[in-house]
Amino acid sequence: GIPCGESCVYIPCTVTALLGCSCKDKVCYKN
């Protein structure tokens, strides 16, 4: 539920995905 500061509208989460973030509602979130 915490925004990671990366969007995933056109491409998936990249850098933040390594930190455990996943795409939700076009934004990368963690918990």
UniProtKB/Swiss-Prot annotation:
InterPro entries: Cyclotide, Cyclotide_bracelet_CS, Cyclotide_sf
The protein, known as: Cliotide T10
Comment, domains: The presence of a 'disulfide through disulfide knot' structurally defines this protein as a knottin.
Disulfide bonds: 4-21, 8-23, 13-28
Protein origin, superkingdom: Eukaryota
Protein species of origin: Clitoria ternatea
Keywords: Disulfide bond, Knottin, Plant defense
Record family assignment: Belongs to the cyclotide family. Bracelet subfamily.
Post-translational modification: Contains 3 disulfide bonds.
